[in-house]
Curated annotation (Swiss-Prot):
Protein name as it appears in the record: Probable histone deacetylase 19
Record note on cofactor: Binds 1 zinc ion per subunit.
Organism field: Zea mays
Compositional bias per record (Polar residues), positions renumbered to this chain: 492-504
Cell location: Nucleus
Amino acid sequence: MDPSSAGSGGNSLPSVGPDGQKRRVCYFYDPDVGNYYYGQGHPMKPHRIRMTHSLLARYGLLNQMQVYRPNPARERELCRFHAEEYINFLRSVTPETQQDQIRLLKRFNVGEECPVLDGLYSFCQTYAGASVGGAVKFNHGHDIAINWSGGLHHAKKCEASGFCYVNDIVLAILELLKHHERVLYVDIDIHHGDGVEEAFYTTDRVMTVSFHKFGDYFPGTGDIRDIGHSKGKYYSLNVPLDDGIDDESYQSLFKPIMGKVMEVFRPGAVVLQCGADSLSGDRLGCFNLSIKGHAECVRYMRSFNVPLLLLGGGGYTIRNVARCWCYETGVALGQEPEDKMPVNEYYEYFGPDYTLHVAPSNMENKNTRQQLDDIRSKLSKLRHAPSVHFQERVPDTEIPEQDEDQDDPDERHDPDSDMEVDDHKAVEESSRRSILGIKIKREFGENATRVQDGGRVASEHRGLEPMAEDIGSSKQAPQADASAMAIDEPSNVKNEPESSTKLQGQAAAYHKP
């Protein structure tokens, strides 16, 4: 795309997609986020966010969005989900003092995989504040919000996991539930979105759908039989995949499954975690998706014209991460960035071809047609969206007036968030696996049990109410209907984009603790 074609209407220009529907897109970025450093040899590199931003600037995409520098999430906001003692630890620990806190490091799973980095608490505040800020924007006229620094889906209520310290996704969903009866979470990272699923496993107001590598692979969760518990039964969907899945095979599952989920669940908002470690050639991944194949998930979810929060996640071949999230920003805007890459600050990273797209490899696709058919068959059971009544709503987050004439859009700030929250009981330590050791046996020991429906519920969650206690409760839902989610073959899938009425019929939602 020629940067000159981006338009001269400032950074509040609504974009028009292929479906003819206008989208108001906002984008959250803190220029300091690229300075955080996990340590020498660590695969997680926040520098990839700065690389992505540089590409967005050179492609002229920033001019088509409202760009905000996020306000850091405050302690009480973080404690809407996380245990206060855990947040206090993240705030106080430093590389210099960590040796004096060995017991707490072990308790909260902070160490080699999730190291104590300089400015750890500020880092968490930054990416969490951006995700919550994006959720707030949906209440003020925006259709799509983007935070590529977010999407850290492994963090638990009181422990770090898989390079993730604070679960910005859960915090954003809790914000969305103030105004939306049902919220859908979709995860296309190669790793199972265990932290988000766990947070909403027993409620029917949030539904989680995760497409991930399953087997001897971190975090070892996400069995197709894990479907939610109690009120949340059938509100967790897991799509376990094998090595080498390509664009065609992936979309043969993604579109029919998500088309049926949107039809049956009817969410008021969608959160899409766009982990780029599912791309071909990722340092820690084993899938074979092209950037266009990965972005097709964004394009498809965008077409429903439901408020859409796009978040980052995994991705460890950082030049491809930047390529992917730049292209997906273009998709969100209804644009098609040209393949030839403009000269930019990190141009040398993208040699020798200097293109936005890279060809997938010729690796074997171990996902057979029979396996894909079996997955569709097993997932073809989903109850209809339940009706829901709100408890007293949490006060709206107030947004001060923005200065539309401010010269530098990167200096804009999103509004202060003033989320009043209930404290939640901390859960016990969960079984820990390492994301750095990819081949990990999956076992069911004393800390897990299988309930009658085949769903797996960690022992610390048995008998607990949903961890997000302030999200309301549903009225008695209808019995599960075996025919409610008969997933069609991909050739039969047709998505009729909804109008700006944003999918009518909102009710309860579901998810894991």
